[in-house]
């Protein structure tokens, strides 16, 4: 492409120049980069927004410009959205509204240009980045693996407020816009095409020439944008009765369960409904008001805090080390198969080994079903699906280990079996720099590594079930585990799309250690005569994704009993297992895996385990009155805070931030609180201490708060 003397600003850090880099080619097409060469991430800071406004004024005043192409500063990066620190810093609704107006006004300059504007999207195009693209006249998306397109703002407790909510309704229609905005969806390119967000998906290597030819075609056609026709469903919703029916249905859904605790989806729904029929400026004004209202809510502040926790965790993936290219997983059960499939789905050539041929066949079928589902949803194309399946080999034999960089066992929770397998891996030629990982959930990593020729290479990589869906990975450091092994585990977790939290080797690690008293107390409340539906509903209304009775059924009473046994042995006297666990195991009412536990196999109604519950209730003398909702929350949630404080004092977790992330991503603690300690500080640590003291007096001494919690409850001025 030949360039003529256009306007260019000197390269540098955003804010050093009054504009962004742009150039003009001989066909009169201006090429505007949203950042400077070498920038790996483009966020919309105040300085960048000012630079964009200045540059668009400059381009608009240049009579040589016939069309404009907007793109990122390099491959694999368009724009990741607004700087979240700006969202965090908004102190009033008026300040939020002013920021929304300023952002939308800047982006609107793209639409106001007299020439066609094409967005050439490759890499992340999220939040404010997509809002910018929606003001362009045509959107091309690269099919590169890095391309992600979406409006995730509701996950921060707000809505797209730079015009994105309104523009998406006008572009794609109400049903599609609601699907994206209310769920904060992030889409792959083909999904974005199907949703009507982008106009065309093109091969990555052809993005620039096709952006150029598209711009020229619009110039030659003498129009800014192509003619578009909304889908029939969207056109029908232009009629008030149809909109009313849709709105009623969605409002009812948003009033139920944890969704009712989040104001952003409800407010976004109202803005979308208005945008479907109201004049454009009125809809923009309502979007602005909504952003101002939402950005200062406690829910938004809590969700933003969790966002920063996840970003800190992802930075652990940048620690020094080599990315794993080849792995072996030993153990073809549910966890081993799930982990192997996860590895294969993220570019790692994986051999899954088990003596049970049927287990290996099931593992292949499970991964194939998952891949086929992703193809149907257009999150994966058929060629990529074949590559995933090709990366997973299954065998009853280990074969050569010479190229294996990560060896992971997910076999039965028997320390001697794990030790024998690890020793065999070393003796069979596992490379000296390879990592030996255990997925144990109840055994000590130090004990597993005992007698292994190279214990410094042994690290716990504790996935939660199901591995493909659960976002947390506990990286467990034993006394002899090297930094290199920990770094490798963290890099792997981030590559798999997970959030690693490094914990010290201790019984139950962090999540199970904190969760055990919660589940044990739920079992105690159940045996006291409280109904499962009441207990579950109380915690659902608090914001948990599922109640404790259903969670016990999902985990399985056999697993709960094993974890409880380990923790009770480690903390004798303080932790005592509920008799319900052993009784359910004896009755084979293990939960969903056995056809039902407390609840039925479908998670509803009474399961076979309720006969066990009633028998145990009858054997308990006296009893307590039916608990109130407040008492249930105090007895379940406040001990969580106390146990977390104990973990911090013992060095199981390094910081409150690590605990917060682990509780949100590991047990589903309501993220709008900003994590467990976010909740505790909002509730008041002194109030929690007083609550536990009262429970210790009136219910049982087990509630007595720890010194670790009492110290944290003392105001800083009094320490």
Task: Please report, for each region that a protein language model flagged, where it lies by residue.
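Conserved CoA-thioester-binding segment of acyl-CoA-metabolizing enzymes
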Residues: 1-71, 108
């Amino acid at each position: 492409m030949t360039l003529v003397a256009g306007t260019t600003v000197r390269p540098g850090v955003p804010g050093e120049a009054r504009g962004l880099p742009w150039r003009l080619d001989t066909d009169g097409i201006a090429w505007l980069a949203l950042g400077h060469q070498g920038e790996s991430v483009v966020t919309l800071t105040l300085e960048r927004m000012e630079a964009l406004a200045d540059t668009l004024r400059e381009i608009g005043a240049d009579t040589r410009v016939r069309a404009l192409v907007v793109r990122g500063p390099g491959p694999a990066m368009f724009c990741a959205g607004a700087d979240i620190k700006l969202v965090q810093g908004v102190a009033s609704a008026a300040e939020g509204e002013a920021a929304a107006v300023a952002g939308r006004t800047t982006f609107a300059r793209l639409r106001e240009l007299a020439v066609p504007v094409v967005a050439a999207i490759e890499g992340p195009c999220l939040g404010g980045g997509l809002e910018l693209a929606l003001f362009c006249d045509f959107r091309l998306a690269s099919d590169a693996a890095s391309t992600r397109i979406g409006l995730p703002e509701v996950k921060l407790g707000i809505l797209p407020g730079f015009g994105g909510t309104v523009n998406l309704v006008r572009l794609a229609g109400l049903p599609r816009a609601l699907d994206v905005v209310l769920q904060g969806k992030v889409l792959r390119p083909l999904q974005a095409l199907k949703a009507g967000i982008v106009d065309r998906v093109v091969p990555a290597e052809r993005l620039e020439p096709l952006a150029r030819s598209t711009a020229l075609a619009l110039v030659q056609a003498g129009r800014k944008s192509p003619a578009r026709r909304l889908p029939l469903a969207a056109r029908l919703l232009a009629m008030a009765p149809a909109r009313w029916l849709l709105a009623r249905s969605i409002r009812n859904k948003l009033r139920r369960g944890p969704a009712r605790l989040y104001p952003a989806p409800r407010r976004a729904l109202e803005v979308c409904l208005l945008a479907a029929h109201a004049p454009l400026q009125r809809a923009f004004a309502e979007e602005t008001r909504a952003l101002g209202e939402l950005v200062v809510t406690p829910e938004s502040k809590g969700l933003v805090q969790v966002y920063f926790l996840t970003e800190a965790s992802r930075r652990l993936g940048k620690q020094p080390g080599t990315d794993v290219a080849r792995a072996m997983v030993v153990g073809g059960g549910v966890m081993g198969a799930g982990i192997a499939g996860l590895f294969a789905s993220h570019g790692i050539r994986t051999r899954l080994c088990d003596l049970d041929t049927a287990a290996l066949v099931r593992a292949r079928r499970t991964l194939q079903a998952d891949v086929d589902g992703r193809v149907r949803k257009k999150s994966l194309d058929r060629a990529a699906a074949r590559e995933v399946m090709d990366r997973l080999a299954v065998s009853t034999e280990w074969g050569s280990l010479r190229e294996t960089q990560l060896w992971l066992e997910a076999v039965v929770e028997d320390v001697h079996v794990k030790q024998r397998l690890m020793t065999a891996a070393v003796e069979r030629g596992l490379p000296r720099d390879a990592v030996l990982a255990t997925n144990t959930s109840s055994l000590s990593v130090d004990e597993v590594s005992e007698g292994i020729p190279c214990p410094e290479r042994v690290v716990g990589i504790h996935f939660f079930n199901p591995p493909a869906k659960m976002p947390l990975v506990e990286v467990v450091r034993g006394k002899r585990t090297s930094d290199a092994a920990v770094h490798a585990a963290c890099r792997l977790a981030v590559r798999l799309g997970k959030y690693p939290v490094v914990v010290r080797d201790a019984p139950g690690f962090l999540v199970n250690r904190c969760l055990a008293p919660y589940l044990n107390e739920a079992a105690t409340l159940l045996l006291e005569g409280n109904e499962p539906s009441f207990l579950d509903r109380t915690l659902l209304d608090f914001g948990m994704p599922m109640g404790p009775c259903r969670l016990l059924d999902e985990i399985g009473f056999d697993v709960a009993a094993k974890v409880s046994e380990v923790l009770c042995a480690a903390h004798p006297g303080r932790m005592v297992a509920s008799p319900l666990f052993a009784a359910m195991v004896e009755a084979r009412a293990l939960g969903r895996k056995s056809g039902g536990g407390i609840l039925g196999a479908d998670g509803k109604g009474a399961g076979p385990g309720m006969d066990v519950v009633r028998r145990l209730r009858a054997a308990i003398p006296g009893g307590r009155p039916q608990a109130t909702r407040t008492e249930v929350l105090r007895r379940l949630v406040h001990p969580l805070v106390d146990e977390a404080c104990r973990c911090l004092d013992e060095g199981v977790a390094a910081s409150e931030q690590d605990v917060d992330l682990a509780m949100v991503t590991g047990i589903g603690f309501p993220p709008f609180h900003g994590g467990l300690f976010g909740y505790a500080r909002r509730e008041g640590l002194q109030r929690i201490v007083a609550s536990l003291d009262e429970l210790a007096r009136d219910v049982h001494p087990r509630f007595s708060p720890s010194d670790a919690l009492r110290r944290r409850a003392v105001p800083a001025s009094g320490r």
